[in-house]
Amino acid sequence: MGGLFTGALLARNGYRVTVLEQNAAVGGGLQTFVRSGERFETGMHMLGGFRPGGSVRRICHYLGILDQLKIRPTDDDCMDSLHYLAEGERFAIPCGRERFAESFAARFPAEADGVRRYVEALYRLSDEVGMFRLREAQGSIFSHSEEFLLPADELIARYVADPRLRDILAYMNPMY
């Protein structure tokens, strides 16, 4: 979510907004490009947060655009598929906080507690950003916990020891 969403949120809150786009079409990171005759889709393939209570759903409702969207649900058992080439393994990533944690706990039983605590940490950290919950900022918007400020690899290492699982979670960190 980028400039258009930000502009819409500012406008919804009474600001006069002008959104500028440097490319020929609006969409920021959702553009495609062609190199050597091959077309590359660079945009997202899936967007979470649209289930009831989800942060993106609440934001779209707040902006008054939810009813205009054509949302197709993802497969509950495999919202995404990760291929870990170093080991030749495939990981089907299920929908939902608990199922996400359970799926990795099943594949990495020695890390079950760490995975659950890591997922809880991600949700705790997202709670520090008032925008995700559509609430007013409390105190300075630039004041966050020590854990919030950690690089992703250090945060993951606090909870997970297995290097393979740390690789997988680090890859997925910006997405989930």
Where are these regions (language model features)?
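N-terminal glycine-rich phosphate/pyrophosphate-binding loop and immediately adjacent elements
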Residues: 1-121
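Rossmann-like flavin
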Residues: 86-176
